[in-house]
Each structure stands twice: as structure tokens, then as C-alpha cells.
């Protein structure tokens, strides 16, 4: 009984310590946001990013964009904003920011990586086979555009493999559609679908 009581007290102390640390962390982040020292904010944002605290990093990147527009830090902020969304699996928004980065900083060191990541966003949004494959087609198009732009890219092999995976998905979906008509005994539709399938493949 005494042992159980001690164990319970230790758990309560641990929970209290965790809560205090969380409150302290929130308070510190609020102070950083209110700070007028942009360099401090920038370094804090990069620290948060390194710690995989993408939400807090994004909040700081957002308030710093106007302060560093046209400066080297502005380029970094634009790129890491996209990276935050990518790592948070918000792929639609990440793709938007990668493309915007490439447009605003066409000669930046991370443009190639950004455009590859943008294509990867479409790949990661590609749905399961039974659903509409618009994102799958878009991913193929994006990877192909990337390859045309950077034929010697270090990402070229990865792009080729991902295109092959996406194309195989479309082939499988088309074949399943043909088989569905056959199983439903809609034979004319099945024949037409199979003919179209064979021509395409």
C-alpha cells in the first residue's frame, strides 16, 4: 500500500513538472513573438525547425517575411516555410510555397530541391486506386516537367522511379475498370474498355 502511494505521488510530481515545462515553453515562445529583435526571432525559428517544432517555426517565419524581404534570410524563410508544411504533411500548401519560392528566387541554391519536393507533394496526395486519379496525373506531369528542366539532376533517378510507380497505378486502375464491366456482364463496354486499355499500354 505504501509502495503504491509513493508510486502515485511520483507520477503526480512528474505530471506537474511536465505541465510547468509546457507553460514555461509557451511563455518563452510568446516572448519571442513579441520581441522586436528580428535576428533573435530568425534564430529561434531555425532552432524550432531543427527541433521539428514546425508550428512554432511557421509562426515566426510568417512574422519575419516582410522584415527580410529581399535579403538572404528572406530566401531561407521562404524555403523553410515550404519545408515546414511538407513535414507537417500539408502537401497542398507545401507545393504552393515551393513553387512560389522557385518563382521569387529562381537562382537560389534550393530551387531544384524545391521543385522536386513540389512534385513529391502531388505524389503523396495521389489517392488509392479506386478513387479519381487527378493528383496522380498531376504528379506525373510535375515530375516530367522537373526532369525536362533538370535532366542531370541528382533527383532524376528518384523522379523516374516515382513516375513508374504512378503510371503502374493508372494502368492497374484502368484494368480494374475493364474487369468491372466484365463482372457486371456489360460485355460491349468491357470490350471497348479492353481495346482502349490495350492501345494505351
Describe each PLM feature range.
Residues 2-11, 22-201:
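Acidic, polar-rich low-complexity tracts and alpha-helical solenoid repeat scaffolds
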Residues 12-18:
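Sec-dependent N-terminal signal peptides
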Amino acid at each position: 500500500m505504501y509502495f503504491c502511494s509513493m508510486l502515485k505521488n511520483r507520477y503526480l510530481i512528474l505530471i506537474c513538472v511536465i505541465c510547468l515545462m509546457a507553460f514555461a515553453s509557451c511563455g518563452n515562445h510568446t516572448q519571442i513573438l513579441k520581441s522586436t529583435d528580428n535576428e533573435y526571432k530568425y534564430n529561434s525559428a531555425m532552432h524550432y525547425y531543427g527541433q521539428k517544432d514546425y508550428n512554432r517555426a511557421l509562426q515566426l517565419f510568417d512574422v519575419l517575411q516582410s522584415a527580410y524581404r529581399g535579403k538572404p534570410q528572406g530566401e531561407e524563410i521562404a524555403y523553410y516555410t515550404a519545408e515546414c508544411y511538407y513535414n507537417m504533411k500539408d502537401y497542398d500548401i507545401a507545393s504552393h510555397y515551393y513553387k512560389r519560392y522557385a518563382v521569387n528566387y529562381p537562382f537560389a541554391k534550393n530551387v531544384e530541391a524545391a521543385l522536386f519536393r513540389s512534385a513529391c507533394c502531388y505524389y503523396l496526395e495521389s489517392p488509392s486506386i479506386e478513387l479519381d486519379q487527378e493528383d496522380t496525373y498531376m504528379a506525373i506531369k510535375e515530375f516530367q516537367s522537373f526532369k525536362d528542366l533538370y535532366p542531370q539532376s541528382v533527383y532524376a533517378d528518384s523522379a523516374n522511379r516515382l513516375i513508374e510507380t504512378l503510371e503502374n497505378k493508372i494502368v492497374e486502375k484502368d484494368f480494374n475498370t475493364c474487369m468491372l464491366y466484365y463482372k457486371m456482364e456489360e460485355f460491349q463496354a468491357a470490350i471497348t474498355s479492353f481495346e482502349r486499355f490495350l492501345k494505351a499500354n
